[in-house]
């Protein structure tokens, strides 16, 4: 099978390309490199010993997308491309709706024009908003999103569901998850955020390597074991494998399927800090700060459905997530700008 991966040069996309190539799939990547590096794909090829077909293109470019589908006879699409920073989405809602919604509509139009009706969508557990219950199952009410990023994911899930309703040949899988962390065991590919990291682990890693001075921990008075917020994290390689497992599910009768991908339990902010200290061998400085508005005490998912229907289960715990992140960060202190 030939798989088109949008956003395939990004953090999750590049790791998914490795797993796809290792599983014997042919891979075509479309990425505008806004928050990614072509070097990631060069390293994907080095890791796997296989070639990736790469197009530096924006999914919002209708002509470019139709040209790519003309040239590459793909069987399915794994869709990662889009803006993804929660905080930035609050400041730049128009950019997020235009990029994520319009871009995906354009992608789906090109797919329809070329008879490609298999899509795995990289959604997010942000669609659950402040969850009605924990652990979160796929039946947890959604649509109470707290930021424009979450709303784009919610809207795109609805759009893809409507596509299947209008044409039952559309085969759609929606994968929901939070907080991918870690890196490939080789240390050759990993998360390379531009500027100050938005997410916890890249920030911790940059404090550990000395690029940033101190981690701010927002709140230590939550109703959790150590008072800091509890979230669920997933190793990016586990997440990539989940997307490959989902491809096999697309071979069954077309419908809309939804799966949570996670470890099934959460880790507090200080759990992550202490695990990273163990991985890097020295202290990670942090400072307790006031709670942030909108933050919730605890959030993690129940991945039972993915285990039962996809045969997928997370293999890595927080220790390995931190070890692999540290290997990537220490070998590549400036990300893909680091000369190898």
Per-region residue spans from a language model:
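Short, basic/glycine-rich phosphate-binding loops at helix/coil junctions
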Residues: 182-184, 221-222
